[in-house]
Regions:
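Sequence-level detector for tyrosine residue identity
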Residues: 25, 48, 52, 73, ...
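N-terminal basic, low-complexity leaders that serve as flexible interaction/assembly modules and, when applicable
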Residues: 3-5, 16-17, 58-63, 67, ...
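Extended acidic/polar, glycine-enriched regions
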Residues: 28-38, 90-146, 171
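Residue-identity detector for threonine
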Residues: 9, 16, 35, 63, ...
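Solvent-exposed, low-complexity, repeat-rich "mucin-like" stalks and linkers
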Residues: 12-37, 167-172, 176-179, 184
Length: 192
């Protein structure tokens, strides 16, 4: 959801996943007042639900000249693009006054069955409730033998977090990032 979106899409109120796979969906919203928004999750599988605020990051080069005619880009202009998932801490986020979204993730360990996930967003001025009928079919896909490789720059973690390279703090960060990567199916890393 781009900050300057003009959303006219229909709400999807149900989704289906297979047992053993993560599921996720977005909730788009706009609060004209720059205020705190309280996020509350209810339902019989809420212990398997994580909510993230989708943060925007600056993009200076959205596409190369060779791809100018490719229709599959959200936008080809520099700007702020939704990319970073920030865990919702203490059930609150800050409204920006433009369109924002929440990323609602359901862990693959959630039990099979038909579940209702309710996410309530409330601010000083209004309250909205988003309900999702979330069906988990009791069938699992076989383990994949696909090798999913991504670059991993441990030196960048040390620079970003301002910790000494190869220090205990750096190794702790490396461990956390690799654990997160494996949670998203990455099973091989390339290091420079």
């Amino acid at each position: 959801v781009m900050p300057k979106s003009c959303l006219n899409t229909e709400c999807i109120k149900d989704m289906t996943v297979l047992h053993g796979e993560d599921g996720a969906y977005q909730i788009a919203f706009k609060d004209k007042h720059k205020t705190k928004i309280k996020i509350e999750v209810k339902g019989d599988i809420c212990e398997y639900v994580s909510v993230y605020s989708v943060g925007n990051v600056p993009v200076m080069l959205a596409t190369f000249e060779e791809a100018e005619n490719d229709p599959n880009y959200i936008s080809k202009e520099p700007g702020m693009y939704p990319d970073m998932l920030n865990p919702v801490v203490d059930g609150e986020i800050e409204a920006t006054g433009s369109y924002q979204s929440l990323w609602v993730r359901v862990d693959k360990k959630a039990p099979p069955g038909l579940h209702n996930i309710t996410v309530k967003l409330s601010s000083e001025s209004e309250e909205r409730v988003c309900c999702m009928d979330y069906k988990i079919i009791d069938i699992s896909l076989p383990e994949s033998d696909i090798v999913y490789t991504q670059w991993f720059h441990a030196d960048c973690l040390a620079v970003y977090y301002n910790v000494p390279m190869w220090s205990e703090e750096n190794w702790s960060l490396i461990e956390k990032y690799i654990k997160t990567a494996t949670g998203y199916g990455i099973n091989m890393i390339l290091t420079p």
